[in-house]
Design a protein with these regions (language model features):
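Short N-terminal binding/cap micro-motifs at the start of the first secondary-structure element
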Residues: 15-21, 50
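Glycine-rich beta-strand-centered segment in the early N-terminal region that forms part
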Residues: 30-48, 56-100
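Adenosine-nucleotide cofactor-binding segment
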Residues: 170-182
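Short glycine/threonine/proline-enriched tight-turn/helix- or strand-capping micro-motif at secondary-structure
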Residues: 19-30, 59
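Gly/Ala-rich phosphate-binding loop of Rossmann-like dinucleotide-binding domains
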Residues: 136, 166, 170
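N-terminal Rossmann-fold NAD(P) dinucleotide-binding loop
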Residues: 162-163
Length: 182
């Protein structure tokens, strides 16, 4: 019998302002078993992003709200513990929407990618080499196509994407104007 416990952070109530600890609950659940085509991942790093404020709201925006009683949605980096998919093997490090929990069973197709082969810390897959960093990189360099000496104005420069855009613009030789706050 599996003695492991899956600690999960679940959304208990919807905040009307800034989320606080009282809006969440920690639940101990059994570690789930993967079915065919699925992978059991043990989370190592969880992402905490500004977008989560919208996810705990009752109002749908670009994605559905997290349901009350559900595990908090989150990108994570984890280690494959068990695999019922030929695409992933135990010991590999992967990233995906695994949630705030110790273990997640996910469809192999929902795993974004294998990480850890670059020699950089695997946590960078949630930051500069993850969704936010790649969004900044491609938005600025492929769409913006800045040239040295130009001025780059970065709104929301204190955010995850904006802070990366500002740094990339500086590297490219731009005069960077960062806007943060009201």
């Amino acid at each position: 019998m599996d003695q492991r416990v899956n600690r999960q952070v679940r959304l208990k109530s919807r905040p009307s302002g800034i989320p606080k600890a009282e809006h969440f609950e920690i639940v101990e659940a059994p570690v789930p078993d993967p079915s065919n085509g699925q992978v059991l991942v043990r989370n190592i790093y969880l992402s905490v992003d500004p977008a989560m404020r919208g996810w705990v709201s009752a109002v749908a925006n670009y994605s559905e709200p997290v349901a009350l009683g559900a595990v908090m949605r989150s990108l994570a980096v984890g280690r494959v513990e068990e695999s019922r998919s030929s695409d992933f093997h135990p010991g590999e490090y992967v990233t995906g929407m695994f949630g705030w929990q110790d273990y997640a069973v996910v469809d192999a197709a929902a795993i974004e990618r294998e990480v850890g082969g670059s020699g950089l810390p695997i946590s960078t897959s949630l930051g500069v080499l993850g969704l936010n960093g790649l969004t900044a990189y491609f938005a600025l360099l492929e769409i913006g196509q800045p040239k040295a000496g130009e001025t780059a104005v970065v709104s929301t420069a204190a955010g995850a994407v904006g802070s990366c855009v500002g740094q990339i613009a500086e590297i490219k030789g731009c005069r960077t104007v960062a806007i943060a706050g009201g």
